[in-house]
Amino acid sequence: VASFKGLRTALPRHNASSGKLDTMETLVNNCRTERMGAEPWKWSKGKMTAMTSLISLQSRGMPMNVKVDGNVAGAYKMGEELYYTRVGQLEMSCANCHEDNYGNMIRADHLSQGQINGFPTYRLKNAKMNSIHGRFKGCMKNIRATPYKEGSEEFRALELYVASRGNGLSVESPSVRN
């Protein structure tokens, strides 16, 4: 696993073959299906979050350095628009919590600035490892919006934008939170 050192710092990134964004989950599943002839794992289930936690751990302490120009510029823009667009019955955007109210309490937790350098993260409230897209899905449900599918183009773009906001921060995965 030492060969994965630094990988987490640069994801998501452009995949020249598919023309899409690669996340750690897509890299794991591509390896499983194309190299191992195995079935893909579900995006946010135990085996996947265990593997992405192990891979992310190899980059712990290294600074995030996600590229946002060139082939990923369109996805970056889409992610930024998703971050600031109000959705759901509560008409909230990511920015309403993670910019306007970070540091305040929501339920039993402090609102963060929405950084993902600690994902996958172990949540005390559900006693398991949680993926980035699983957290996005949970946020959307909390504001009564219809969430995108984990692994969707929208969530990959949002992951790129949010990861780029953490450029320069150290990878802390796997982390622990309420």
Question: Where do the model's predicted regions map?
Answer:
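Short acidic alpha-helical/loop segments enriched in Asp/Glu that coordinate divalent cations
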Residues: 66-68, 91-95, 107-111
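Post-cleavage N-terminal segment of exported redox proteins
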Residues: 12-77, 121-147, 155, 159-178
